[in-house]
């Protein structure tokens, strides 16, 4: 492959650290768990100061108060009698309805089905798929009615054990897992290549670039640096916790800077779809005052392109849609058609095509000269 390519992308590199596994009997990702992982024992959970019944909190249940609210809807009038058993202060979901796929099979589309699908998620812990005596905190369980029924002390304890599990406990374990697998990928392309003049990667002829977006474990950065794999840096998907927009000028050298991936709306479409976000971007990322323009004008798009070109990232790879966006005459009149892939829509296919012909592009000397000038001004053009 190194005869044809100077670089390759490792898609969803986080899967080499761990994957999110959703049981076959369920539909919602909230009921999944990381594999591999280091789940808790009951004793470890109680060591955090959590006093609840861990095994009981693996079974979907709601309080009498929650049940009363659910049954206020006339379509749910028989909810308690038909689908729950009373256990002290709790209404516990009957075993036949603890599978989301079973619910979809047994109940027609409607309010009751929707309610039961939601109630199945009313757990604080999920048993490990392999070792039933071990437990994973349900991700985001703080948004359940069940969490709201805990004492203040148990809420604090659960928050601690939840965050420790997802952000600390597994970090080194996941790093070790990745080191068993990722080197096999990078070393498989081992060959001498002129790209090594720019990128001395222990003889590897192709430059590995990771797609490391999403819920990124803290250990990913150190593993990628150790293996000299470029990270992917996107301004509106910063990796720093609590930061709304990153600053491309802060990107690490071993990275690829881009405005959007093929799974994201290009800048113009994102601006159009996210009025509140684009307003914040106008102030926080571009440092302008006043009201943001209703659409991403050519001037705005050029400003964002320049910012990425000027980043310290080794590579700046921008989508063609974002390049064309800097031209008032060549940009598409229909930005809603420019997103290549919409992951949430299974019926949307990779149908994007450039709206210009190659002949038209060749003749657009003003645009071509401008692109070259922008790249040259950033120091990325080897004259």
What kind of region is each of these model predictions?
Residues 1-383:
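Catalytic cores of glycan-processing enzymes that make or break glycosidic bonds
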